[in-house]
Structure formats: structure tokens, C-alpha cells
């Protein structure tokens, strides 16, 4: 279902949610860390979703082993590099990798700014090696509170020229966007784009807040937007993109089934909705699965899938000239 004449993008992809099981095993051994299993086969159930989780917080716990083995800055550089290698293997032309430097740093008390630098370096090396274009989105992990998010913001600002956008992710219900107004004021002052996880665990009001108070240009997941007709109209009229992640929303029990997923409704309503992975290694999926398996099961027609692919570049955090250059590159 992928149109090979168009750029293939993944603009909602967590770098720290895409740490290979083999890499977790390798780093665990390298740093003599205690892992829940000693072989790759027995480790996978601990680091990958094998059945739908009851909620988002339970799903997020599957990510923890990936960051628990990041005992050095070089380990952070390695997983960033491997993220680009994975993107190339999936046939992606352009990827936006988002990461929470505080989350990656916390287990082994790494310097947050150093983690940011290591990720930048790994991505740069990967793009050069595998001929993939990438941009970085810094995440503030709301779950850890306002002060921790401020630390993340400071670490990202130290390398502001290498960061394209900032995001707010984590426990949406427990830590609403209203707690982070000053953080986003500074992010906008830095000239960054804004995307926010909203309407995943909380309702449409969380999406409104992300747009009106935090300045969101795009919304991560946003599945609850369908509950508010005025919001749907606003998203379409203002060209505020939705970063849809089909399989992820089922695995987190955010949506009961693919048939009930709102992506088809978004596209029918003229919302610039897209197809993305979210946390590929944890989910056990890739972008090809989302296009060829998940999207048809969600009721999307071939033309709607193509439109979602077009939208992926349309709402990417690239300049118009960069988008056109990518179109021409793929068209040959």
C-alpha cells in the first residue's frame, strides 16, 4: 500500500522506544547489569508488547529496559545510530526521532546535556552512513514533573540548533499541559516547532489546551478529537496535523480495535492525519506493517492510505524547499 513514487516518512517515532532487544542484551552484558533474562528469546517478552496492555502507563513500562542499559554516553550514541539504520532498513526517506534526554539519563545519572549531544552525534553518523534524512524532537517527560522537564529543556536548549521541535509526552492524565506553560514559552522563543501528545489518555480538552496554551502545530495521537466536532473542524481548517499510530493505540488500549480507530474519520474530515509507528521495537512493528496491515484493517482505502503518506511530508517540520527537494529525490 506504500506509494513508492512518494517520500515515505515516520514523524512520530520515539528513539528511546526503539532500542533493539539485542542491543539491550549487549549493553546489559557490557556493563554487567542485571537483566530479566539471559537470552534474546527470553528477553523479548520483557521488552516487547506480546499482548495489549491495559493502559498507556502499563505500555510505557515496557520501554524501561531500553533506557536502563544506557550506562554511558556512547551507549546513547549507539542506539541513536541504530535508530537511523532501522529507518533505512524500513525504506524511510525521512524520519523525525523524538527522545526524552532525562528519561535516557536517569538510571545511570548521565548528564542530560551530554545525552542530547550523544544522540545528535549518533543520528548525524547514521544519516551519513545510511543516506536517510532525519530531524530531532526533544521530549519533556511530563510524568517526572515540572522541575525534571525544566532540566530536559535546558539540556535541549544547549544544543538548540540541532533540535527541530519540542514535545510533551508521558502521563497525560496526571500531568496536564497547564503545568508546562513557561516551558513552552521558552521553547517557542528558541524558534522550535511544537508538537504535543494529547487526546490519547485525556479528552478533547487536552488537545484544545495543547493548541491554545502550548502552541502545538501538530498533535501526537489525538484520538479523542473525534468526540468534538468543533475541534475536528478547527484541526482541518488550521491545518494542524495528527500523528496517528494505529498499532500503538490498540496496544495501549487507547482504542479498542483497528476498526474503531478514528484515522479514517480524520482523513474523511480533511484533517492532515498521518501514519507512524511510535515505539517500533517495543511494539514489534515497523512502518511497512502500519501501511500494509494496520491501515487496511482500520478501514482505510488505497487512496486514503496514499493521502496519509502525502500528509506525512506535508506536516513534517521541514521548509517548503526541503519538502520539494525530497519529493524530487524520490521521484528520480
UniProtKB/Swiss-Prot annotation:
Cofactor: Zn(2+)
Positions annotated to bind substrate: 14, 16, 170, 279
Gene3D superfamilies in the record: Metal-dependent hydrolases
Pfam family, one: A_deaminase
Annotated Zn(2+) binding sites: 12, 14, 197, 278
Cofactor: how and how many bound: Binds 1 zinc ion per subunit.
Marked site (Important for catalytic activity) residue numbers: 221
Single annotated GO MF: adenosine deaminase activity
CDD domains registered for this protein in UniProt: ADA
UniProt keyword Cytoplasm present: no
GO CC annotations, alphabetized: cytosol
GO biological process: adenosine catabolic process; hypoxanthine salvage; inosine biosynthetic process; nucleotide metabolic process; purine ribonucleoside monophosphate biosynthetic process
Active-site feature positions: 200 (proton donor)
EC number(s) recorded for this UniProt protein: 3.5.4.4
Keyword Metal-binding (UniProt): yes
Family to which the UniProt record says this protein belongs: Belongs to the metallo-dependent hydrolases superfamily. Adenosine and AMP deaminases family. Adenosine deaminase subfamily.
Its biological purpose: Catalyzes the hydrolytic deamination of adenosine and 2-deoxyadenosine.
Protein name per UniProt: Adenosine deaminase
Gene name, Swiss-Prot/TrEMBL: add
Amino acid at each position: 500500500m506504500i506509494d513508492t513514487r512518494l517520500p515515505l516518512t515516520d514523524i512520530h517515532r520515539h528513539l528511546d522506544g526503539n532500542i533493539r532487544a539485542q542491543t539491550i542484551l549487549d549493553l546489559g552484558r557490557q556493563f554487567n547489569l542485571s537483566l530479566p533474562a539471559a537470552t534474546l528469546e527470553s528477553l523479548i517478552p520483557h521488552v516487547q508488547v506480546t499482548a495489549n496492555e491495559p493502559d498507556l502507563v502499563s505500555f510505557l513500562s515496557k520501554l524501561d529496559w531500553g533506557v536502563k542499559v544506557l550506562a554511558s554516553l556512547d551507549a546513547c550514541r549507539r542506539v541513536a545510530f541504530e535508530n537511523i539504520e532501522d529507518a533505512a532498513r524500513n525504506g524511510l526517506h525521512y524520519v523525525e526521532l523524538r527522545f526524552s534526554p532525562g528519561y535516557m539519563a536517569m538510571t545511570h545519572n548521565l548528564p542530560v546535556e551530554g545525552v542530547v549531544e550523544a544522540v545528535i552525534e549518533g543520528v548525524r553518523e547514521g544519516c551519513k552512513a545510511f543516506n536517510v534524512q532525519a530531524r530531532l524532537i526533544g521530549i519533556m517527560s511530563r510524568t517526572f514533573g515540572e522541575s525534571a522537564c525544566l532540566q530536559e529543556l535546558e539540556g535541549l536548549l544547549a544544543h538548540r540548533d540541532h533540535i527541530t521541535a519540542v514535545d510533551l509526552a508521558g502521563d497525560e492524565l496526571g500531568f496536564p499541559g497547564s503545568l508546562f506553560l513557561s516551558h513552552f514559552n521558552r521553547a517557542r522563543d528558541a524558534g522550535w516547532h511544537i508538537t504535543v501528545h494529547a487526546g490519547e489518555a485525556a479528552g478533547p480538552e487536552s488537545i484544545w489546551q495543547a493548541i491554545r496554551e502550548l502552541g502545538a502545530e501538530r498533535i501526537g495521537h489525538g484520538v479523542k478529537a473525534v468526540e468534538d466536532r468543533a475541534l475536528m473542524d478547527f484541526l482541518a481548517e488550521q491545518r494542524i496535523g495528527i500523528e496517528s499510530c494505529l498499532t500503538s493505540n490498540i496496544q495501549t488500549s487507547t482504542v479498542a480495535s483497528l476498526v474503531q480507530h478514528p484515522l479514517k474519520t480524520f482523513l474523511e474530515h480533511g484533517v492532515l492525519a498521518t501514519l507512524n509507528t511510535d515505539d517500533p521495537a517495543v511494539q514489534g512493528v515497523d512502518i511497512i506493517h502500519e501501511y500494509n496491515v494496520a491501515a487496511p484493517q482500520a478501514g482505510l482505502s488505497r487512496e486514503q492510505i496514499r493521502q496519509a503518506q502525502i500528509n506525512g511530508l506535508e506536516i513534517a517540520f521541514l521548509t517548503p524547499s526541503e519538502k520539494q527537494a525530497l519529493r524530487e529525490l524520490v521521484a528520480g
